[in-house]
Amino acid sequence: MDQWNRNYRNLPGKKIGVVQGKTPEEIIECYTFMDKHADVDKIAISFDYSLYEQIAPHENKYMSWMLGRAMMLANMSQDIINKNKPHHLLGCGLPQEFALYQDYKWIESVDTSNPIVHGIKGIAYKHYGLQTKESIKLVDLLDVDISNEQLYDINHNINYFRTYVNG
């Protein structure tokens, strides 16, 4: 890692490390490595670790992913998360998950195509969010001609998404 940091530290742009692992111990070990040893500007945490289904078992895997990441972050924020380092959340199981993080000032950014994909598929967010998720990637929808109804749903979803994130 020291050699990698020496060779690539001065490249333009920001460096982001993505936490990997299948157990709480692996996640914590990888997170700690990213925080203390990897010369990264930001730490990213994914939405679909298999671990989440063990942390928060639910018949709906997307609910497990949402609640599992929220529970993991709540536990890690007590004494593991470096609140002085920016964090990024990769994707989401369900978009309303981001409402759970409004007090986590260390989360600097999130990314998801969820509002767009669901709008294209004609699915408008409800006030509570969604209960399921379309499993199609935005890249597979790039050539779709967007109707006025789909555009309305996309904008509707983006507005709801903003309220989940910002309150």
Regions found by a protein language model. Name each.
Residues 1-100, 104-110:
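Eukaryote-skewed repeat-based solenoidal scaffolds used as protein-protein interaction platforms
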Residues 36-38, 72-88, 94-167:
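Alpha/beta catalytic cores of nucleotide-metabolism and tRNA/nucleoside-modifying enzymes
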